[in-house]
Each structure stands twice: as C-alpha cells, then as structure tokens.
C-alpha cells in the first residue's frame, strides 16, 4: 500500500496531525451519539473522538459515523477506550453516567456517578489541559460541580448543559400558545435542570413587548389563564413524558449541545442558559452550580447576565440552590 501511495502523491511537507477543532464525546449511549451526530452534521469540528468503556459498541458507532463522512464536510472520526486519543481537545462533552435504579435515592445515584467521573475527568484534563468541559450527564448541576472539583480547571471552563434545553422547550410551548415562531419568543428557565427550575416570567417578551407588563400576575397562582401550569409545568414534565413514550431523550439535547459547541468554536459570544458556579449572584453565597444566562466564547464563559428578577423569582432560585447544595454536601469525593 505504501508504494501505491508514493506513486500517487509527492510529499512536499509533513502533514499536520494536531487539530484545532477537536471535540471529544465521552459515552456513546443515545445522548452521546445524538451529540456526536449533531456536531458532525453541522460541520462544527474537524476531528471527533468517541470514548466509552464498551469497546464493541464504541467501534460500531465509530464505523457508522465514518461511513457517512462522504456526505459531510471532512471530519476525522476516531474512537478508543484509551483517553490518550482525546489529546488536544478544544471541547470535551461528558454524557457517560449510571442510570437510576428503581427505588434508588437521588444521592445514591449521584454517588455512583461521582465514582464514574473519577475515572473520566482527570483523564480528560491530563490529555487536554486547556479544554472546556461540557457536562450533559444527569443530575447535570451536581455533576458539573463534581467535574469542577475533580478537574481543577477554572470555573469558566467547566459548565453543564443545564437549562439550555429547558429554555428551548419553554420558548417552543410559548410559541404554540402565541402562534408565532419559537425563535421570536424570548424567555428563560433558570436554576436547577429539574423539578425546582424557575421560569422567569418577568422577562418573557415578544419583540420587546413584555407579557408581565400586560398581565402582571402571569405565572402566579392568581393567573386565571394558567400560564405556569400550561407552560412551565409542561417544560418540567416533558422529559419524563418523552422517556415514558420512547425510553430516553436524545435529539433535542444533541442539538442543544451542538449549538453550544458552535458558540465555542466560532467565539460567537451567544447567551446560553448553562449550569455554572453561581456564588455571588442573586444573593447566593455558596459554591453551587445552577443555570443562569451566560455569555459563551472560545475560552468558555465570560459573563453572567444580571437579570432583574422579581422577589418571588429570587426566592425560587434560592430554594433551587438550597436543594442542590444539600445533595452536594452529601457527596463523598
């Protein structure tokens, strides 16, 4: 084969092997592969590495993506159980983790995932010390905190997918109620990616028209149009419903992760609702990870948007922080 290659090509300089647009995805389950596929399909990376502990499935997923490369912009797809393959990654996306067993407490699930992360995070940092780490595994807020502690990286380079998808679901449901495009609805879900998330009704607007000014009790118990029940509750329940119907969620989170990756590679400075260390914001004084709107660039997070929340929204955010802090404090690192 080498002689044939020499007959085809005349080398004038050695090829560059290291990549400046490299993404690693850890975990090749439904979510991990949805992330990998979305990144590949949107031509965001020139090298995509997959890592998992199940060698056969890992190889199969790699081959399946490789066989589609003729239909995309060129991207090198690699896979291995050895983390050395991840060296030089600009972004590491962590989707691996244990699933909740029937009757298992949340803290028990978190602790099992902590043990898994102990084998993942130090390896990623070892081979890519300048990387940004995006945590997708659930419970995402607590595991992002765990990742920050295990990695030793500055807090701006460790963040979770958080309520970015929740915010997208929120806008979609608002768009259905208002009969306009989701991209024309502006609204945010902050706090925990989970049951204690907070819908920022005070900021929901269409073309600068704030719904809260038109209907001051929107989202509150006195709201006779039941916006909270019809919109926010559906946001919280939607993942449970999808899991009940098809067994897992994958495509929407994959698209969300691809959009975040695009923000890093293009240094677009878009605002996303990502899980970050919220100490010092909205009166929270502990190292707890929750989602707030943040500005994302090529080196990670640069700013937190200082939303003007109502007293009720701040209190709900504090309740969310308290619930997550209790879980964090129970973790054995």
From Swiss-Prot:
One of the record's GO cellular component terms: mitochondrion
The encoding gene: ldh-1
InterPro entries: L-lactate/malate_DH, L-lactate_DH, L-lactate_DH_AS, Lactate/malate_DH_C, Lactate/malate_DH_N, Lactate_DH/Glyco_Ohase_4_C, NAD(P)-bd_dom_sf
Residues at the active site: 193 (proton acceptor)
Transmembrane segments: none
Catalytic reaction(s) noted: (S)-lactate + NAD(+) = pyruvate + NADH + H(+)
Residues reported to bind NAD(+): 29-57, 99, 138
Protein name per Swiss-Prot or TrEMBL: L-lactate dehydrogenase
EC class name: oxidoreductase
Pathway info: Fermentation; pyruvate fermentation to lactate; (S)-lactate from pyruvate: step 1/1
Assigned protein family: Belongs to the LDH/MDH superfamily. LDH family.
E.C. designation(s): 1.1.1.27
Keyword rRNA-binding carried by entry: no
Molecular function terms, GO-annotated: L-lactate dehydrogenase activity
